From Swiss-Prot:
Protein name per UniProt: Cytochrome P450 3A21
Binding, heme: C442
PANTHER family: CYTOCHROME P450 3A5, CYTOCHROME P450 FAMILY 3
Function: Cytochromes P450 are a group of heme-thiolate monooxygenases. In liver microsomes, this enzyme is involved in an NADPH-dependent electron transport pathway. It oxidizes a variety of structurally unrelated compounds, including steroids, fatty acids, and xenobiotics.
Top class in the EC scheme: oxidoreductase
Signal peptide start and end residues: none
Gene: CYP3A21
Family label: Belongs to the cytochrome P450 family.
Record GO cellular component, one term: endoplasmic reticulum membrane
One record GO biological process: steroid metabolic process
Length: 503
């Protein structure tokens, strides 16, 4: 048996002990849920249950919900994750015990200076940053931002008109991706870009590079399986966020800030300016104000959080309207009644449109971009008879809850009437969570909704959308880490008349 190396007994023993220790390292947490009497799929050494994610988070969560009931345990590598669906426990996790036990989201690898971004920051650091940013998202500030967003709505209409004139079906993600990029770079950095027609613009290139992110990426998976790599990578200055992109944006924001501090007479209302004002406000204690690096981190996280959610949701809405022409017509009638002769929308007129709100809410139910909500348990706790040990990640499977027939009649169907005034009060706020809920919900929720509604109003004033032979019906979701379609959403776009107002 020449292929077996001739090693000393001690060496073989050392090798055997090393393998046993390695196996124990890769499996030592995997008995937790069995010990607690919580069901779930069988984990593999080191990997846990992450291989199931290849079928998509949404599909895996739906299958677990059907198979195991209202609670189950999974393992992301060695990390125990407890899925809960009881609205009372969800309320305790997201609201009642948010500040004391479930303050933080799960850390997801080396992030460098981005650790101070509001979505990533922890404990007192998060509370300080949230309190500094909250005034930026008041209704008064949003009102002032409407004209900024509206100007990109005009660019969107021009681009749609140009594409429609070619007589070819239009890829919704391309069009709304450009709109989303323009609004976010405009409101976060104060730069004016028509990104669809200027794809080489350095801001566009840097932000797009920043957005190439997938939870099933080998780099991300390796950190999930071997969490001890995170501090090593942090020490080596390696980050999940591409360094060339963050470096470009850091320099750009520094330059823009210096320019604005010199030109104090010009009145601006965008996120960057509001954060600069917060830094210099007499009401903000100097030791609590945002540092320049923290300001950059917030601007970058606004891109990260806002681009995909806005562009994808708008694409899903247009698909639903195209495949439900009665809903599209009813929505256009509401828009025309509130804003005759293609009048521009204002903050107050948007709030008057009940049916628009219903359409957006129902689309967010069918396609919640945040498929899961997560909080880390900071100490051993018992909630409604369920013991949750310290260090466990508590996960709310939003997508699965949005399709639970116990809460939604015919959950697969697009029915905006679910969110009518008469029905809205019957919806449990801990079952319908497209933006999360509680103190750590999405801080930009109202901005995101206003942004999407302004785009929809301007587009539907000027165009109607129809399916074409390239449109995938029914829509199929891609298997993978993010909520994306298997094929691009492609629709036929028809001008409602021969002219486009204001474009």
């Amino acid at each position: 048996m020449d292929f077996i190396p001739n090693l000393a007994v001690e060496t073989w023993l050392l090798l055997a002990v090393s393998l046993v220790l390695l196996y124990l390292y890769g499996t030592h947490s995997h008995g937790l849920f069995k010990k607690l009497g919580i069901p779930g799929p069988t984990p593999l050494p080191f990997l846990g249950t992450v291989l199931y994610y290849r079928q998509g988070f949404w599909k895996f969560d739906m299958e677990c919900y059907k198979k195991y009931g209202k609670m189950w345990g999974i393992y992301d590598g060695r990390q125990p994750v407890l899925a809960i669906t009881d609205p009372n426990i969800i309320k305790t996790v997201l609201v009642k015990e948010c500040y004391s036990v479930f303050t933080n989201r799960r850390p997801f690898g080396p992030v460098g200076f981005m650790k101070s971004a509001i979505s990533i920051a922890q404990d007192d650091e998060w509370k300080r940053i949230r309190s500094l940013l909250s005034p930026t998202f008041t209704s008064g500030k949003l009102k002032e931002m409407v004209p900024i967003i509206a100007q990109y709505g005009e660019v969107l209409v021009r681009n749609l008109r140009r594409e429609a004139e070619k007589g070819k079906p239009i890829n919704m993600k391309d069009i709304f991706g450009a709109y989303s990029m323009d609004v976010i770079t405009g409101t976060s950095f104060g730069v004016n870009i028509d990104s669809l027609n200027n794809p080489q613009d350095p801001f566009v290139e840097s932000t797009k590079k920043l957005l190439r992110f997938d939870f099933l990426d080998p780099f991300f998976l390796s950190i999930t399986i071997f969490p001890f790599l995170t501090p090593i990578l942090e020490a080596l200055n390696i980050s999940m966020f591409p360094r060339d992109s963050t470096s470009f944006l850091r320099k750009s924001i520094k330059r823009i800030k210096e320019s604005r501090l010199k030109d104090t007479h010009k009145h601006r209302v965008d996120f960057l300016q509001l954060m600069i004002d917060s830094q210099n406000s007499k009401e903000t204690e100097s030791d609590k104000a945002l540092s320049d690096l923290e300001l950059v981190a917030q601007s970058i996280i606004f891109i990260f959080a806002g681009y995909e959610t806005t562009s994808s949701t708008l694409s899903f809405i247009m698909y639903e309207l195209a495949t439900h022409p009665d809903v599209q017509q009813k929505l256009q009638e509401e828009i025309d009644a509130v804003l005759p002769n293609k009048a521009p929308a204002t903050y107050d007129t948007v709030l008057q449109m009940e049916y628009l709100d219903m359409v957006v809410n129902e689309t967010l139910r069918l396609f919640p971009l945040a498929m899961r909500l997560e909080r880390v348990c900071k100490k051993d706790v018992e909630i409604n008879g369920v013991f949750i040990p310290k260090g466990v990640v508590v996960m709310i499977p939003s997508y699965a809850l949005h399709y639970d027939p116990k809460y939604w009649t015919e959950p697969e169907k697009f029915l905006p009437e679910r969110f009518s005034k008469n029905n809205k009060d019957n919806i449990d706020p801990y079952i319908y969570t497209p933006f999360g809920t509680g103190p750590r919900n999405c801080i930009g929720m109202r901005f995101a909704l206003m942004n999407m509604k302004l785009a929809l109003i301007r587009v539907l004033q000027n165009f109607s959308f129809k399916p074409c032979k390239e449109t995938q019906i029914p829509l199929k979701l891609r298997l993978g880490g993010l909520l994306q379609t298997e094929k691009p959403i492609v629709l036929k776009v028809e001008p409602r008349d021969g002219t486009v107002s204001g474009a």
